[in-house]
């Protein structure tokens, strides 16, 4: 009888613990190891480009807005670091400022080239903003040549470390 009670208790414990385990992780956008979706980019001349046009190259995609000091600083730092140290890596900066003039004046004050700057015309109301869950904070992504996210929320220091490891391999 002791063994029957013990077995029943063990079975009930297993069933309850199996039911209590979450099957899905909470999602906050796209993560390293996942393929980044195609993003339609609009530049200052309102010309459309696609992120997939850059396949075969390493790309840093940076989401930012002039009203967010942290994302604006990251935009300047990443742009300058890549321009000076890794010009072969594409830098795509996507602004979510609802007023494009604000973004353009911010770029001028920050002395950034317009060639790698893009605008999300619907700002924070856009599907892109929602898909990447940017309400929780602006992010940036390092994308490899195959369109796979290699790292996210990177700094110039992180890039330096990543590229040092890659060059030593």
Region locations from a protein language model:
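Bacterial Sec-dependent N-terminal signal peptides
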Residues: 1-27, 169
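N-terminal "domain-start" segment that seeds a small globular fold
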Residues: 22-51, 164, 168
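Short active-site neighborhood of thiol/selenol oxidoreductases, capturing the structured segment around
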Residues: 50-72
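Hydrophobic beta-strand anchors of alpha/beta hydrolase catalytic cores
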Residues: 60-61, 91, 140
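Structural microenvironment flanking redox-active thiols in thiol-disulfide oxidoreductases
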Residues: 72-110, 124-129
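Short, internal strand/loop/helix patches
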Residues: 108-145
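Thiol-/selenol-based redox modules, centered on thioredoxin-like
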Residues: 136-169
């Amino acid at each position: 009888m002791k063994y029957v009670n013990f077995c029943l208790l063990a079975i009930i414990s297993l069933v309850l613990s199996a039911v209590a385990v979450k099957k899905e992780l909470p999602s906050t956008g796209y993560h390293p190891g996942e393929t980044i979706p195609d993003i339609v980019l609009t530049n200052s001349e309102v010309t459309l480009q696609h992120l997939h046009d850059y396949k075969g190259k390493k790309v840093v995609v940076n989401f930012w807005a002039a009203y967010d000091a942290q994302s604006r600083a990251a935009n300047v730092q990443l742009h300058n670091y890549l321009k000076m140290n890794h010009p072969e890596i594409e830098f795509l900066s996507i602004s979510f400022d609802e007023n494009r003039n604000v973004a353009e004046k911010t770029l001028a004050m920050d002395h950034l080239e317009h060639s790698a700057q893009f605008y999300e015309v619907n700002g924070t109301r856009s599907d892109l903003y929602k898909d990447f869950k940017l309400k929780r904070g602006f992010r940036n992504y390092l994308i490899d040549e195959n369109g796979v996210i290699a790292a996210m929320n990177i700094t110039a220091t992180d890039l330096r470390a990543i590229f040092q490891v890659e060059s030593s391999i």
